Amino acid sequence: MNLEVVVQLGSLSLIVLAGPIIVLLLASQKGNL
């Protein structure tokens, strides 16, 4: 596998993992307000 492919897969996995976490953080902030 090429390094570029590994980087792209890594960035996609990070986005997929970070997406729900960011949504939960935003929801908790709105709930506190």
UniProtKB/Swiss-Prot annotation:
It is found in: Plastid, Chloroplast thylakoid membrane. Keywords: Chloroplast, Membrane, Photosynthesis, Photosystem II, Plastid, Thylakoid, Transmembrane, Transmembrane helix. It holds the Pfam family PSII_Ycf12. One of its GO terms (biological process) is photosynthesis. It comes from the Eukaryota. Signal peptide: none annotated. GO terms for cellular component: chloroplast thylakoid membrane; photosystem II. It is a single-pass membrane protein. The chain crosses the membrane at residues 5-25. InterPro entries: PSII_Ycf12_core-subunit. A core subunit of photosystem II (PSII), probably helps stabilize the reaction center. PSII is composed of 1 copy each of membrane proteins PsbA, PsbB, PsbC, PsbD, PsbE, PsbF, PsbH, PsbI, PsbJ, PsbK, PsbL, PsbM, PsbT, PsbX, PsbY, PsbZ, Psb30/Ycf12, peripheral proteins of the oxygen-evolving complex and a large number of cofactors. It forms dimeric complexes. HAMAP family: PSII_Psb30_Ycf12. This is Photosystem II reaction center protein Psb30. It comes from Mesostigma viride. The gene is psb30.
